[in-house]
Design a protein with these regions (language model features):
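Membrane-water interface regions at transmembrane-helix termini and the short interhelical loops
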Residues: 22-25, 94-102, 116-137, 195-198
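Hydrophobic alpha-helical segments and their helix-loop junctions in multi-pass secondary transporters
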Residues: 139-165, 180-184
């Protein structure tokens, strides 16, 4: 649970969620509904992949050989690799901008480098360290999210905050797709974490721990 909760508390989900209003011109209510539907549906596919981990004990990309064959799986690996390079780049750029916003003496490019180095070090240290950081982040950043929501709703400066924008089917479906894809994008590697669980762990336990840690939580951040 904390792995996916902590991993989804970041600037990128917030920026992504804002697209429903900023890019697709939905109002707040329809934007929330679209994001909720997308995450709850997309999260099912993501959590089902996670549930395979303890049962099979191998990385998700290796599992794809059963469906696509050895050569066909290489295409899946390449597509996933390109996707995660973009995901990593987006995160470190926002990390650099966030760091600059907190400490304005740190230039954005330097902040980006710091974010990249920090991510690399965490990855090198490994799996257990990632779990420790996410357990801490769940509490620290979770409290920060609650405080942030409280500040936003008590310091709204615009009279049309709740009514700005309107429903349009194309924008609503695009926002649903965006939210669903946020969850589905984890599927190519989600079982890389759950495969370390005992083989006799219940499938339902793995599914719900992943689903509840990612889908509803990502929804609140977006």
């Amino acid at each position: 649970f904390t792995l996916w909760f902590g991993g989804n508390i970041a600037p990128l989900p917030i920026v992504t969620g804002a697209l429903g209003v900023q890019l697709f011109h939905l109002n707040l209510i329809w934007g929330i509904v679209a994001i909720l539907v997308g995450h709850l549906v997309g999260g099912v596919l993501m959590a089902l992949h996670s549930a395979q981990g303890p049962q099979m004990g191998i990385p998700q990309m290796i599992q794809s050989r059963a469906q696509f064959g050895t050569l066909g799986a290489l295409l899946v690996v390449v597509i996933a690799g390109v996707m995660y390079i973009g995901f990593f780049a987006s995160n470190i750029v926002l990390a650099g901008k966030s760091l600059h916003g907190v400490v304005d003496t740190v230039p954005v490019p330097v902040g980006i480098v710091i974010g990249a180095l920090g991510s690399g070090i965490i990855g090198i240290i490994g799996y257990r360290f990632i779990h420790v950081l996410n357990r801490i982040g769940t509490w620290v950043l979770g409290i920060g999210i609650v405080v942030g929501f409280g500040y936003i709703f008590t310091h709204v400066q615009s009279d049309d905050f709740l009514t700005r924008g309107s429903f349009n089917l194309a924008g609503w479906l695009a926002t649903v797709s965006l939210a669903a894809l946020w969850q589905i994008a984890f599927a190519p590697y989600v079982s890389d974490y759950s495969r370390y669980l005992p083989a006799d762990v219940k499938v339902s336990s793995t599914f719900w721990s992943t689903y509840l840690g990612s889908a509803p939580v990502s929804y609140t951040h977006l």
